[in-house]
Design a protein with these regions (language model features):
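Active-site-proximal specificity loops/subdomain of glycosyltransferases
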Residues: 60-107
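N-proximal low-complexity "stem/linker" segments adjacent to membrane-targeting elements
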Residues: 1-46
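Short, acidic, metal-binding catalytic loop of nucleotide-sugar glycosyltransferases
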Residues: 43-55
Length: 280
């Protein structure tokens, strides 16, 4: 999600004390704001039903929402509607300690937004990897891989995310090479230095953060916890695609990744061909 948050203007309503039902290695979480699916969203949820196996699935939605589609196979969890009022509220929610506390009974959550595809049932091997966060890789303008990336289809270790958000201090000694490259642009460095000057831990940085939530997890979260580990861009070409899906498949040895995000926006012709071939 390439969107921006206006600090202090997002009226989140923390859902403390709430818990997602059940527990285990993985919960697939689909945030949803409308009770009606578009045709493309219906395709995406059908791939989740087809390849999601027996992994538990949850629709996370505003309180009072009525579903006009079949929700068989999904548990539901209603939150205050303020937490879904626009992309800014969503980004802020995804950087909130109370959000990950909802899933404390699970080792991982797989965020599967309604514009995602699940292309394989091989989810379990990714749960065995040591990483805290996996998302579709970002590319540089010249087509080179940049970093692990987008949060729309992302695997997250719940305990590691909670450790970051509860951290009281950051350490510059944890800066990785990809993080350092971003800091050289200036904007990220100003955020970091400004935060370190004020203190306040991860909660303080999040309160002033005006970028998309996945950028927080990629470029800042590792500074707050030694346990928060990220894969390289090369290591996630098998996990997901967003932009440049053909290039992702090429880099993955000609194989489709586990999933995709924003598939209708990036090379739709490729995905139409791919979905048709999977249906045969």
């Amino acid at each position: 999600m390439r969107s921006y948050i206006k600090p202090g203007l997002v009226p989140l309503v923390p859902e403390t004390g709430r818990k997602a039902p059940g527990g285990g290695r993985l919960l697939i979480v689909t945030p949803i704001i409308s009770g009606r699916l578009t045709p493309d969203e219906a395709i995406g949820l059908e791939t989740l039903r087809r390849h999601g196996g027996d992994w538990p699935r949850l629709l996370l939605h505003p309180r009072g929402l009525t579903f006009a589609f079949d929700t068989t196979g999904f548990a539901t969890l209603a939150l205050d509607p303020a937490n879904f009022e626009g992309i800014s509220a969503y980004n802020a929610m995804m950087m909130s300690a109370w959000f990950y506390a909802l899933f404390e009974g699970y080792e991982h959550i797989l965020i599967f937004q309604t514009d995602c595809l699940l292309l394989s049932d091989r989810i379990a091997p990714w749960l065995d990897r040591p990483w805290s966060y996996c998302g579709a890789p970002y590319f540089r303008r010249n087509g080179e891989l940049k970093s692990v990336g987008n949060g729309g289809f992302s695997l997250r270790k719940v305990a590691d995310h909670r450790a970051v958000l509860n951290a009281s201090s950051a350490s510059l000694g944890r800066i990785s090479v990809p993080m350092a490259r971003q800091y050289l642009k200036g904007t990220y460095l100003r955020y970091l230095l400004g935060h370190l000057a004020k203190g306040g831990g991860a909660a303080g940085l999040v309160a002033d953060f005006d970028r998309a939530e996945d950028e927080f997890w990629i470029y800042y979260a590792p500074l707050f916890s030694d346990r928060f580990r990220l894969p390289s861009a090369e290591e996630v070409v098998g996990f997901a695609a967003e932009s440049r899906p053909r290039r992702v498949v090429e880099l993955n040895g000609g194989r489709l990744p586990l999933g995709a995000h924003a598939w209708m926006k990036h090379d739709r012709a490729f995905w139409d061909e791919t979905l048709a071939s999977l249906d045969r």
